[in-house]
Amino acid sequence: MFCFQCEQTMRSETGAAGCGGPKGVCGKDEATADLQDVLIHQLKGIGQYVTRLQALGRRDAEADSFILYALFTTLTNVNFNRARFVEMIATAARLRDRLRDAYAEAASEAGQTPEALGGAAAFIPADSLVGLLAQANVASVRAGAEAVGEDVIGMRALLLYGLKGVAAYAHHAEVLGETREAIADGVARVLDLLAGDPVDLELMLEEALALGRVNFTVMEALDAANTGTYGAPTPTPVRITPVEGKAILVSGHDLRDLHAILEATKDTGINVYTHGEMLPAHGYPKLHAYSHLAGNYGTAWQNQQTEFAAFPGPIVMTSNCLIEPQPLYRNRIFTAGPVGWPGLRHIADGDFSPVVQAAKALPGFTRTEPERTVTTGFGREAVLGAAEQVIGAVKAGAIRHFFLIGGCDGAAPGRNYYTEFAEQAPDDTVVLTLGCGKYRFNTHEFGTIGGLPRMLDIGQCNDAYSALVIAQALAGAFECGVNDLPLSLVVSWFEQKAAAVFLTLLALGVRNVRLGPTLPGFLTPALLDILVNRFGVRPITSAEADIADALAPKAAA
């Protein structure tokens, strides 16, 4: 086992990063980690055939969908169930064989001789768990490191981990019916590239930026899927204290699963609560219309073991981030979609009736607590609807600066920086936020500025798309570039969705992003130098110093 894909990966005193041994920091055991590597190796081979079929005018929707789902299962804190990975490895082998035959047929019909592909495209997985684990060394993210060096391994990892984030967002869009050929083509292109074990750093950097542009398309598609299905988010106060009654808790990111649970509990007297990244769901009109969507319970993912133990009903994990379930709630937590943990009940078919039955059998909340709320739903349409008011406040000097403080939360030391940054931001500045990092400060009383709330919750991590559209619209209004706006991006990262968003920011030319609490362990000093020198990426320091730097007058170019 070797894994260094997330922010919490083990780090030695010398600075070397990576989890090994029997279990990673996230709780992923060695066997599961190795099986994930084997699956990704197979996906590279599938990508080789998909790209060649695309070049011959053939498309394969099953392959496109499987790639997204399978990559999603390998994200941090998504699926820990080795049996599911053994099944997916077998499925991948059958799919690869079918694609190989389809490619040979298509090439023959086009009067071409098909390439004899080796490596990942020719990989034959063992037919036993022991055999699969013995094959993991050829699939490791560090395979060939002694020959190619750490910089190449790190750049390949940046591509792979960004690709995982892209796939996760694309899967969320796909389940709501939003698919685009450009997305499937971009994903397969990177898999095909990685299958060839690239060593050219400049080529891989260009491909990483191209992947960032693909991710912008993916986030646009997911935005279209979410708003097309559930309406454009509107500013909505969300109760954060419970009400008396039976209850279900829904965590993760998947709005379709939340909608299905709301439908399944309609007229049952069961209340539904969101958790973590599901908080922004309350801003979507068609979801908010369910009167039994009672509020948001708890905070960010890393606090779930305490929060889930105290919740008096069943819990559904619809996507990342799952932590090892504790005995106090293990028998009442369900997984759905790409999520998995050995021994937990899995909802594979969208039928949440077992969850409803569990809610009826559990006590629920026995009393209604005094109401407290937070506000979400400041999506691009809501903010741009007030654009004249915002622009007027900037021109009048009421708003001096915008801080986008967003991204993933986590348990590692140093994340209090984001709380301090938001709370220390001067009263003439606006705080925009997205992702579960908002829980660090979203109950703080920020007040108003120019008739607008000083803290605007834009949504989930994928709603970075809304933030970018807002920034581009403001740049157009002020007749300047995004980098010339009074706007600073202060990003907290944790896993691979954040890596995809980061690549999008770089691809769109957004400079001077502050990134923390630590920099990715897979990026070597040489790769970090590239990001610093070419894109102005900088690590966070202290809230006080970084605020002062952001607000300091900038020298004329």
Curated annotation (Swiss-Prot):
Entry keyword Cytoplasm: yes
Biological processes per GO annotation: response to hydrogen peroxide
Reaction catalysis annotation: A + NH4(+) + H2O = hydroxylamine + AH2 + H(+)
Needed co-factor(s): [4Fe-4S] cluster; hybrid [4Fe-2O-2S] cluster
Positions of hybrid [4Fe-2O-2S] cluster binding: 253, 277, 321, 408, 436, 461, 495, 497
Residue positions where Cysteine persulfide is found in the record: 408
Annotated keywords: 4Fe-4S, Cytoplasm, Iron, Iron-sulfur, Metal-binding, Oxidoreductase
GO molecular function, one term: 4 iron, 4 sulfur cluster binding
Binding annotation for [4Fe-4S] cluster: 3, 6, 19, 26
Location within or outside the cell: Cytoplasm
Co-factor binding comment: Binds 1 [4Fe-4S] cluster.
Chief localization: cytoplasm
One GO CC term, this protein: cytoplasm
InterPro entries assigned: HCP/CODH, Hydroxylam_reduct, Prismane-like_a/b-sand, Prismane-like_sf, Prismane_a-bundle
Domain of life: Bacteria
EC numbers for this chain: 1.7.99.1
Keyword presence, Iron: yes
Task of the protein: Catalyzes the reduction of hydroxylamine to form NH(3) and H(2)O.
Family from the record: Belongs to the HCP family.
The protein's name: Hydroxylamine reductase
Natural source organism: Acidiphilium cryptum (strain JF-5)
